[in-house]
């Protein structure tokens, strides 16, 4: 059985992420224990709230260096994906610098912010997270900040402007949407992370 650990970032959506894995039949544990995090097979970095509050929590829990040195697969969700980049304009805070890119506020194009609801996702590179998921499938988003498309983007979406819906580099993967709120496609993505992403 794969040992899946949800990193306790002190944010609000930890239990909903855990329930999503429970529904798929996977055992998960929410923790900020450094030894449990280091020994996990796969890790989830969830996030809801602001980048500066999340980085403060990670610093207080001595998790920043631990996360930066992980060699097993890590999936960042929503703010968790944004924390994987170099810097967030939200609070003007340096983030984990796991994947190049910056997180910026979505520009005003007349659409309401935050983006809240279903949006189409276009895969631009092969990625095991999306195995069996149809191109241009819909996923559920809630966000006002986003990562511009770059060389690490594996999927993009559009909300007035294009942005990275998913990024990946080495063992680090991130999705801007909430798979735990994205129905069968989100469930399949989480299953793919457990069963298809190598470790």
Curated annotation (Swiss-Prot):
Keyword Cytoplasm: yes
Active site: 78 (nucleophile), 178, 180
UniProt GO cellular component terms: cytoplasm
GO biological processes: L-histidine biosynthetic process
Tagged with keyword Amino-acid biosynthesis: yes
Keywords from the named record: Amino-acid biosynthesis, Cytoplasm, Glutamine amidotransferase, Histidine biosynthesis, Hydrolase, Lyase
Cell compartments where the protein resides: Cytoplasm
GO MF terms, alphabetically ordered: glutaminase activity; imidazoleglycerol-phosphate synthase activity; lyase activity
UniProt-recorded name of the protein: Imidazole glycerol phosphate synthase subunit HisH
